[in-house]
Each structure stands twice: as C-alpha cells, then as structure tokens.
Swiss-Prot record:
This is Large ribosomal subunit protein uL18. It comes from Rickettsia canadensis (strain McKiel). NCBIfam families: L18_bact (TIGR00060). GO terms for biological process: translation. Belongs to the universal ribosomal protein uL18 family. HAMAP family: Ribosomal_uL18_B. The lineage of its organism: Bacteria, Pseudomonadati, Pseudomonadota, Alphaproteobacteria, Rickettsiales. InterPro entries: Ribosomal_uL18_bac-type (IPR004389), Ribosomal_uL18_bac/euk (IPR005484). The keyword RNA-binding applies. Keywords: Ribonucleoprotein, Ribosomal protein, RNA-binding, rRNA-binding. It comes from the Bacteria. This is one of the proteins that bind and probably mediate the attachment of the 5S RNA into the large ribosomal subunit, where it forms part of the central protuberance.
Amino acid sequence: MRSAKLKFEKRRSRIRHKISQTSNRVRLSIFKSCRHIYAQIIDDSKSITIASASTLDAKIKKLKKSHCNIENAIKVGKAIATKADSAGIKEVVFDRGGYKYHGVVKALADAAREKIKF
C-alpha cells in the first residue's frame, strides 16, 4: 500500500510532465502549507518568476492564526490575477502541484479565472 506522501509525489510529477508538454504558456503554480498559501506565475523557458502572491502579503495578512483557508485563497487568487494582468499575461497553465482540486485550491483557481484564462 502506498503512503500518502508517495501518492502526492507521483501525482505532482504526473501533472508537471503534462504541463511541460504545453510549454508555450507560463504556469500558475501553487503551494500550500498548514498556515499559508502561495501562488506564482513562472516562465519555465526563461526560469523566472513573473508574479507572486501569498497570504504573507501585507494586504492579505491579518491577525488570524491560520491563513490557509478558502476566504484568503480567494484574496490570493484575485491578487495574482491582478499582478498577471498588469504584467500583460492573459493565458496560463494551472499547476495544482499535486494537491486535489478541492477547497482552497479550487477557490484560488476560480478567483484567478476572473482575469486570467486557463
């Protein structure tokens, strides 16, 4: 029986392989920890980060103990969409990073879809 960590790593590598085949677009990558959620727009051909947003940003950060919830994921999604729009990015590939498309990940993606197409 596979452990949860091994399943996660296998899922992440499978997603990254599929994304690497569509290399003509930049990718919106997310990472979530127990306390925070991070989003980055990365250009893999140049190996640079174009824009980033997280719950550590001053506009999003509050006095709550946990910032990795749906309410803050929506704020991070809107922030990354605004930064991408100002950088002139209209289309991205969504890299959920091995996380299941549910809850916080879905909320961030739906909020980012307001200004970015993926």
